[in-house]
Amino acid sequence: RIPWKELQRHFASGYTLVVDLQLDLIEAGYQFQQDNSSQIELWLNANLIQQVSIEQARQWFNDDASLWACVVAPWVLIQHPD
């Protein structure tokens, strides 16, 4: 887990993606690492992986949220443990 405040510079660069809790974060990271574009496209089209919105980033900042993260350069995949 990592505090959102430590991920803000990645967000500012446009490289943070939020992974829906229906998906396993490590499996999603593996598919990115394998460059499995067909699987990633399916997840993107189903909104299971999305860019972190400004509203979500602001909420995580205000809540001092701690998130699960998986780095697959240049991407940082994030899940918020509910």
Would you name each region that the model predicts?
Residues S13-L17, S37, I49-Q50, S66:
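A general structural signal for well-ordered secondary-structure junctions
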Residues E27-Q59:
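Short, hydrophobic/π-rich interface segment
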Residues Q50-D82:
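Short, compact, well-ordered microdomains
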Residues G14-T16, E41, P74:
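Generic secondary-structure boundary/loop-capping signal
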Residues L21-L23, L44-L48, P74-V76:
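Generic secondary-structure microfeatures
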Residues R1-Q34:
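N-terminal, charge-rich interaction modules
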